[in-house]
Amino acid sequence: LSMIPFHTGRAREKLDLLLSQEYRDGHTNHYFFPIEGYEPVTRIHSDNHLWVVMAVYALVMEEGKLDYLKRDIPFYDGEKASVWEHLKRSIDFVYQNIGTHGLPLMLHSDWNDMLYKVCREGRGESVMVAFMLGLALRQMAELAELMGEENDYLARYEAMKETVNRVAWDGEWYARATMDDGRFLGVKREPMAKIWLNAQTWAVLSGMAPAQRAHQAMDSVRRYLNTPLGIKKIDPAMADYPTPEDPLTYYNKGCGENGSVFCHANAWAVIAECLLGRGERAWEYYSQLLPMNAQAKAGEWRYKAEPYVYSSNIFGPESDKFGLANVSWLTGTAAWMYVAFTQYLLGVKPVWGGLSIEPCLPPQWESIEITRIFRGCRYHIRVKNGEKLFIPHEEGRTHYERTDDTTI
C-alpha cells in the first residue's frame, strides 16, 4: 500500500507476484519465498485473500485506470485469469466458508495467528474478517460499476452488516470471534480477553458499525486498551484461558499477542478515529507510537530498540518488562502508519475522480502544506485548520460526506 503512491510500476510487479499465489478457489498461500525458493506455507487463513482486493483497489484509484484489472495472472494451481477474476474469486472463497452464526469461518487463523485454536474443529468464526469483507465488498462494488458489470456486492455488504451487528455486538464493543463450541471470544462475560482492538477498529473501517456503536466501540478502546506507549491488543491479558490444559496462548501476560502494544494494529486505530472525525485522538495515537517518542517515554534502558524504526510490538503494562520493544524492522506498521498519516490525518487520498482532500487535523495545528505527485502532476496543497471540509461518520455513512467539492 505504501509503495503505490511512489512507484506504481513496482507495485504492479509485487501485485503480480502476490496474485500468483492465489488458488483457483480464491484462497492464497500464507507465506511464500520467491528469493530462497522454499516451499510455500499452504495453511489457509481467512484474511489473506482479502488484502489483495484492498491493494489492487488502491492501485486502481492511484492510477485512475482499469487496465490492470484486465491483466492475466496465473493461479498457483494452474490456469490463468484476469486480475478482476482473481478478486472476484477472493470474495467468493469467503462465502464458501461461512459459519453457523453467518460470519466467515476462521479457518487456520486470521490476521492474528494466535487464533488458530478457535477453529480446529472447523466451526470457529472471525468477526474481524467479517468487517474486512465489508470493506472489500464496498471496494468491489465500486470497481464493478467502473467495469460496467452488474453485481450484488452492496447487497452482500448490507446482509453481512446486519448479521455482524446482530450477533457480535456486546453492548459496549464488538466480540472478536467465535470458538468451535459456539462461545464468543472478546465479550464482557468472559474472565479474560474481554475486548480486542482489531474488532473495534475494523468495525469503523468497514463502515458496518452504526454511528453510535462506532463511537462507543472506539471509546471502549481508549478506556480499556490505551497506554502511554500505544494501544494494547487485548484486555485483560490471558493466563490459562480458556482452559489451563489448552490455552489460546503460551505468551506471558503483556507479551506478543497476549496484551502487548501491537504496533501494526495501532495504525488502524488512527484511521478509525479519523473516520469518526476525532483528529486530536487520532494524532495522539499516531504520535505516541512514533519510535522516538515511545523510546523517550519508556527510556532507552527499557525500550532497547532503534528510535527510527517501528517494532512489531512493545511489552504491555501487565508485563514486568512494560516498554520493551520487540522484533524491530519486521512489521507492517510503517506502511500502514504512512497510509494513516497521509490519507486520513492529512486527508490526501486518491479516488477515481481525482485526489480527495479531506483532512482530520488535531486542533493545535493551524494549517498544513502537502506536496503530492499524482497521475503525472505535482500538487501543492495548503489547508487551514477549522475549515469545514467534511461531516464525520453518521448513520448510513461509511466515510466522510463532502460538504462541497473537495476532489481535485
Language model: regions and residue ranges:
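Alpha-helix initiation and N-capping motif
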Residues: 12, 66, 150, 157, ...
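Active-site acid/base region of carbohydrate-active enzymes
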Residues: 9, 15-27, 50, 57-127, ...
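Non-catalytic C-terminal accessory modules of carbohydrate-active enzymes
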Residues: 223-226, 239, 251, 255-258, ...
